[in-house]
């Protein structure tokens, strides 16, 4: 598994439906980039200029919404993950 550093977070991307309600299969070019996922790993937090470590506000297991083009996409063991900074997360969904 990936271990993020600092204020970085590893997100498991939530897949969207590939067909419409009417049964039409969407080609790859018609799909929107996902903006939600599940937190699977968090870093230790950012360090301030005074040397104080500030813990992250999100936790493993949180369902989050993030900026559309944020982070770096990686594949590990066939699973898609996104590594992004805490500041790229817009909200935690309940």
Curated annotation (Swiss-Prot):
Subcellular location as annotated: Cytoplasm
CDD domains recorded: cpn10
MF-aspect GO terms: ATP binding; metal ion binding; protein folding chaperone; protein-folding chaperone binding; unfolded protein binding
SMART domains (UniProt xref): Cpn10
Keyword Lipoprotein (UniProt): no
Keywords: Chaperone, Cytoplasm
Keyword Electron transport (UniProt): no
Pfam hit, one: Cpn10
PROSITE patterns, A to Z: CHAPERONINS_CPN10
GO biological process, one term: chaperone cofactor-dependent protein refolding
CC terms in the record's Gene Ontology section: cytoplasm
Chief place where the protein resides: cytoplasm
Task of the protein: Together with the chaperonin GroEL, plays an essential role in assisting protein folding. The GroEL-GroES system forms a nano-cage that allows encapsulation of the non-native substrate proteins and provides a physical environment optimized to promote and accelerate protein folding. GroES binds to the apical surface of the GroEL ring, thereby capping the opening of the GroEL channel.
Subunit organization: Heptamer of 7 subunits arranged in a ring. Interacts with the chaperonin GroEL.
Family recorded in the similarity comment: Belongs to the GroES chaperonin family.
Name of this protein: Co-chaperonin GroES
Name of the gene: groES
């Amino acid at each position: 598994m990936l271990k993020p550093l600092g204020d970085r977070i590893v997100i498991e991307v939530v897949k969207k439906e590939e067909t419409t309600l009417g049964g039409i299969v969407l080609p790859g070019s018609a799909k929107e980039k996902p903006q939600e996922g599940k937190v699977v790993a968090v870093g230790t937090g950012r360090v301030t200029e005074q040397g104080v470590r500030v813990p992250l506000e999100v936790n493993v297991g949180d369902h989050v919404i993030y900026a559309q083009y944020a982070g770096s996409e990686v594949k590990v063991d066939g699973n898609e993950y996104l590594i992004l900074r805490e500041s790229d997360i817009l909200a935690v969904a309940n």
